[in-house]
């Protein structure tokens, strides 16, 4: 059998400031402040997933948007 792990060793570290995230309310962050700061980074474009740039389409309505317009009468 494996040895039991001390609960303080299982406690994850805050994804933002690396303190122990004790309260489960804001997990994986230690506080609302860290959670909000991380959200702000996402909203400002601070985190970017690498990959090919997406092409902008000329038709903003999407595919098939104009198909049913002629048969409406």
From Swiss-Prot:
Which cofactors does this protein require? Answer: Zn(2+)
- Relay the cofactor remark from the entry: Binds 1 zinc ion.
Positions of the UniProt region annotated as Disordered: 54-73
> Could you tell me which Pfam families the record lists for this protein?
YacG
Metal-binding as UniProt keyword = yes
Please verify whether the record's keywords include Disulfide bond. Answer: no
Which positions bind Zn(2+)? Answer: 14, 17, 30, 34
Molecular function (Gene Ontology), one example: zinc ion binding
Set out the biological process GO terms recorded for this chain's protein: regulation of DNA-templated transcription
Entry superkingdom: Bacteria
SUPFAM superfamilies attached to this UniProt entry: Glucocorticoid receptor-like (DNA-binding domain)
Q: Which UniProt keywords apply?
A: Metal-binding, Zinc
Family, per entry = Belongs to the DNA gyrase inhibitor YacG family.
Q: What does this protein do?
A: Inhibits all the catalytic activities of DNA gyrase by preventing its interaction with DNA. Acts by binding directly to the C-terminal domain of GyrB, which probably disrupts DNA binding by the gyrase.
Assembly, in brief, is: Interacts with GyrB.
Instruction: Name the PANTHER family on file.
Output: DNA GYRASE INHIBITOR YACG (PTHR36150:SF1)
Name under which the protein is recorded: DNA gyrase inhibitor YacG
The organism's taxonomy opens as: Bacteria, Pseudomonadati, Pseudomonadota, Alphaproteobacteria, Hyphomonadales
